[in-house]
Amino acid sequence: MKLLKDLLVDRKEFEDWKNNLTWARDGTLYLTTFPDISIGQPKYAKDINCNSKNLFHVKEFPLEFENKLDFELAQQNGLLNSQPVCYPRVCKPSPIDDWMAVLSNNGNVSVFKDNKMLTNLDSKGNLSSRTYHCFEWNPIESSIVVGNEDGELQFFSIRKNSENTPEFYFESSIRLSDAGSKDWVTHIVWYEDVLVAALSNNSVFSMTVSASSHQPVSRMIQNASRRKITDLKIVDYKVVLTCPGYVHKIDLKNYSISSLKTGSLENFHIIPLNHEKESTILLMSNKTSYKVLLEDELHVTADNIIAPYLEKKFKKWSTIWNEFNNYETTLVIHGISLSPDGYSIAIVYDMERVAFKYKIASEQSFNIMFAPLYHTWTISERAVGLAWYQTYQIYNQSLPKLPENFSMNKKLLNGNYPISLDFQSYLNALMKSEEMRIIMFLNMTIDKPSILSFLEALYEYAINKKSELTNSFDLACVLSIAAILKREAPIYNGTLLMKNSFLEETFNLESFTADPETVTSTTNNTWKRCGVTLLPILTTHVKICPVSKQRVIDIKRDDLNDYGWFTRGLLERFNEISVYCGTTLEVM
């Protein structure tokens, strides 16, 4: 496939970490540039001209950190005494929520929503137990685990208060190293209900973490070693780790170990190929890459997925900047991240001469390459909104695999609506359905986005609860939906009084059945409709969908109108996410 033109990151500087790039579920790229994080904010364009700059807008994303150890004097880790300024080492967005956790250089793990800090994780204990060097999100529930300098895993759970704000609290801890040992926890990976951690003495532990296991029991699956672990992943219940000269596989079913000599002392990145029929990974370093099949024994083949693209880019660069081969040149990889759905890969790299040269940040320029890992792709629940659109463009605008005879008017959940649920749970069930995910994606590829299937599901719920529809805003909404679907409406009589900061307008309920795009008041003024509730938009407090351009009333700022349970529920559920395509709504 033809690749998109690389995304450029100019006038920035990376620290010497290998986890400098993360791809979030909404399509945002997080880059741990110094001193402030940079992001590749996803954006929508109908025609991107095969250029990734039309999919991402690179900008600085400054965060304010707290240092809980600011006035502590470290006895064992003297580096903490000499690093008063906080800067990011690792960024990881939550796989199920819109939060991001950041590990700083001085042992803090902070959680942010947008650029607002929610918490700086902390627990009781001595300094070493409160100093963190790695963390991982729970892939299933809202919780997070951190590893400290005492060889201990600390689990923090999350609950939401009455204002729907998350509160993080220390729940439990598991000690991996022996008492009195000073081995740090350096790696944590969490796959479904399996958690694997490695210590600074290169021993590896595994445990099963689930709702039923209140106190997980750890098991050592690799003894301490003098070879430093450089990367650690879980692939199909197999632990894969790399160290200088070797790659090891530990089967979690029988704890058998297979090893393979790589023939290179390079630090390898492990790239799981989760959508292959057999357990397969790519091993990638600055100089070489391999494809490894994780059977009983490890089988190595040439990398025919990423290597050809990188070799082509390296030859092109050498033709321009090292035409006569006067210099030794190398490709330096600063970070690798799978797309949230696992179908694509992003690699941040640069080409450089092997020579002593002083560079300042304003001279730096890095490239981010996007490449497909397979020939086809499907719409995944692990991604949302523009992340699907990015995969679509990376695969040269090839459509994903769709169910047979699928249409935009297909009933959600095959028409088996869970009417017995409360309204918010019902909306969540609709949005999580496979049909709704496909509709939201297809809305990004057509000229006139449609949510008729979603309106059909809303109508069925409203008719089932019609005895509870007494509010005029709710009645107007249901009347509008019935008119669009050409279905029977519960009531036609009555009026609706709607307000904004400057005026009031009265509407006959009958007027909501005339035009699906606009509503005319009794004073003969015509108003555009809200994209979710189909109510007239009088207020300036609205948000807009970047794809469909539909406007939605911002319920958090519009406090003048007495919305009912139906319309208020819709506006609260879709206050941040577009029902048309799953993208983040933009504030106007």
Swiss-Prot record:
One of its GO terms (cellular component) is nucleus. Keywords: DNA-binding, Nucleus, Transcription, Transcription regulation. The record marks 358 as: Involved in the interaction with TFC6. GO terms for molecular function: DNA binding. Residues 399-588 are annotated as: Sufficient for SPT15-binding. One of its GO terms (biological process) is 5S class rRNA transcription by RNA polymerase III. It is found in: Nucleus. It comes from the Eukaryota. Its main location: nucleus. TFIIIC mediates tRNA and 5S RNA gene activation by binding to intragenic promoter elements. Upstream of the transcription start site, TFIIIC assembles the initiation complex TFIIIB-TFIIIC-tDNA, which is sufficient for RNA polymerase III recruitment and function. Part of the tauB domain of TFIIIC that binds boxB DNA promoter sites of tRNA and similar genes. Plays a role in TFIIB assembly through its interaction with SPT15/TBP. Essential for cell viability. Heterodimer with TFC6. Component of the TFIIIC complex composed of TFC1, TFC3, TFC4, TFC6, TFC7 and TFC8. The subunits are organized in two globular domains, tauA and tauB, connected by a proteolysis-sensitive and flexible linker. Interacts with SPT15 and directly with TFC6. Present with 2070 molecules/cell in log phase SD medium. This is Transcription factor tau 60 kDa subunit.
